Amino acid sequence: MITTQSISDIRKQVTAWRLKGETVAFVPTMGNLHLGHITLVKEAKTRADHVVASIFVNPMQFGQNEDLDAYPRTLADDQAALIEAGAELLFTPTPDIIYPKGMDAQTFVEVPSISDELCGASRPGHFRGVATIVCKLFNIVQPDIAVFGQKDFQQLLVIRTMVEDLSMPIEIVGIETIRETSGLAMSSRNGYLTTEQKDQASQIKRTLNNMALSLKAGLLIKDVVAKAQAELVHVGFRNDYLDVRNANTFAIATAADKDLVILVAAYMGSTRLIDNLVVKLAY
């Protein structure tokens, strides 16, 4: 696997593959890779001739009081994992390479409406940072396919919308959330949890499952949400949001909707965890 910080090196290699009529899949990450990331790379390998990955801890998507400096940097381990998974090219730019004029002078991409709700409301500017870096990386790599995890459901929808609105010729593939044996969604931030907190955090998935059963049984959405919020508080969470949306439009769900997604963000100690569950009701 070739590792480079150079935009021109990335473009030269991708161009060489293109001249042979070969396809390229892309998996952008912030590093500190776990099995969820590796699953994305392996899936990408089945969908294209070549896989490009990136590792960039994007300062634009972190808020003032968030953990940018504390975010783990584990490049050597990440490289070994990517090689084993089948990636052939790794882009590891620095902030100076991505934002040479500084972030305040950087042209940005913002997807309206979706970016301002839930995680966007809790983390103002977060999705502008996500959309901007993903747009830049897409322009640098120019992949045929890009693979993302569904754990970040709202982020995936933001990226799909950006690609559609800007007429980017890229297929966006979402992969089902990879979980630990306890049911806890795999996340780089799980490393911040103590053993006891990880055990408590596994309640998120059980709560989502209980909500799905209640919704399928025809209970009112507001009652299902209220009960679930209480469950999470009982095991030690501080709720950020818990909501049920239309899985296709992201509008607040109504009794008439059949394709739903339950989305949750909650704090265990100082660590913010997110998860979701898609629920299909009978027509």
Curated annotation (Swiss-Prot):
InterPro entries: Cyt_trans-like, Pantoate_ligase, Pantoate_ligase_C, Rossmann-like_a/b/a_fold
Binding site for beta-alanine: Q61
Compartments where located: Cytoplasm
Molecular function in Gene Ontology: ATP binding; pantoate-beta-alanine ligase activity
UniProt GO cellular component terms: cytosol
A Gene Ontology BP annotation from the UniProt entry: pantothenate biosynthetic process
PANTHER family registered for this protein in UniProt: CYTIDYLATE KINASE/PANTOATE-BETA-ALANINE LIGASE, PANTOATE--BETA-ALANINE LIGASE
This protein's name: Pantothenate synthetase
Organism of provenance: Shewanella pealeana (strain ATCC 700345 / ANG-SQ1)
